């Protein structure tokens, strides 16, 4: 009887242990199911993040392509402006040569004017000797003296205008040098943007290394694109300013050419008057 009781007690204890183990296994099963659900949720979130990262990568890549296209357009504009500046520089060189030639003509005209003045002085002495001549001769001498005075005034005025033209040409050269400096700065900025774009391209290749690193770099890429876009706008603004400067220089060159043409015509008129004066003086 005692053996049966002991056996029943052992069976009861074994039953209780089995129940405890069953409850523990059920709890472990519930914990495992919860962990599985959490892992599945984390996996879904990770897949969504990966999809978002792929979309962000596509957007960043598209912005990069747009920045490269704008950069190429800016390079073309800078090349065109360099060609315009080169042509303007050539015109200014020709203008300087023309000014030098006109300065030589001015010197020649001045020398001839001095000779005419000496001849006028001789005419005055001759007029005093020939005071007995007719009133018509006196009026002719007065007319010649007035023409000589007018010729002197025209020559002095032409000399002042040439000095003014030379001063404006110097100012134009300074503006041209500034425009060239701006173009060089724009070209240097474009080279800098190209290097930064290369760096961005290399960084993008490592975007897929890990989800954490890609998420950390996303903000940096967007900031880099905004910075590149701003710098590209700055380069375009500088290029626009350089275009306005080139246009202004071209207008100044055209105006100087018109002034030179007018001065040439005045000099021709002075030369014709001097020739006529010499011819008239020779007649006395």
Swiss-Prot record:
It comes from the Eukaryota. GO terms for molecular function: protein homodimerization activity. InterPro entries: Tropomyosin. Residues 1-273 form a coiled coil. Keywords: Allergen, Coiled coil, Muscle protein, Repeat. The keyword Repeat applies. One of its GO terms (biological process) is regulation of muscle contraction. Belongs to the tropomyosin family. Tropomyosin, in association with the troponin complex, plays a central role in the calcium dependent regulation of muscle contraction. The molecule is in a coiled coil structure that is formed by 2 polypeptide chains. The sequence exhibits a prominent seven-residues periodicity. Homodimer. This is Tropomyosin. It comes from Haliotis diversicolor. The lineage of its organism: Eukaryota, Metazoa, Spiralia, Lophotrochozoa, Mollusca.
């Amino acid at each position: 009887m005692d053996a049966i009781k002991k056996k029943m007690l052992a069976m009861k204890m074994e039953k209780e242990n089995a129940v405890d183990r069953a409850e523990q296994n059920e709890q472990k099963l519930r914990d495992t199911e919860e962990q599985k659900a959490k892992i599945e949720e984390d996996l879904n979130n990770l897949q969504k993040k990966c999809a978002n990262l792929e979309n962000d990568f596509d957007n960043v890549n598209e912005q990069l392509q747009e920045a490269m296209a704008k950069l190429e357009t800016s390079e073309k504009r800078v090349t065109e402006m360099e060609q315009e500046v080169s042509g303007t520089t050539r015109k200014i060189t020709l203008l300087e040569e023309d000014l030098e030639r006109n300065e030589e003509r001015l010197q020649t005209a001045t020398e001839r004017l001095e000779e005419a003045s000496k001849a006028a002085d001789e005419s005055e002495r001759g007029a005093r000797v020939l005071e007995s001549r007719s009133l018509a001769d006196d009026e002719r001498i007065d007319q010649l003296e007035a023409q000589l005075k007018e010729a002197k005034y025209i020559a002095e005025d032409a000399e002042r205008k040439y000095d003014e033209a030379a001063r404006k040409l110097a100012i134009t050269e300074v503006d041209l040098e500034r425009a060239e400096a701006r173009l060089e700065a724009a070209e240097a900025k474009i080279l800098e943007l190209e290097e930064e774009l290369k760096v961005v391209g290399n960084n993008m290749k490592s975007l897929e290394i890990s989800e954490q690193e890609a998420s950390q770099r996303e903000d940096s890429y967007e900031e880099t694109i905004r910075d590149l876009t701003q710098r590209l706008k700055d380069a375009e603004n500088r290029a626009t300013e350089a275009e306005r400067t080139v246009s202004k220089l071209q207008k100044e060159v055209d105006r100087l050419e018109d002034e030179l043409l007018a001065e040439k015509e005045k000099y021709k008129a002075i030369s014709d008057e001097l020739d006529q004066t010499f011819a008239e003086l020779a007649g006395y």
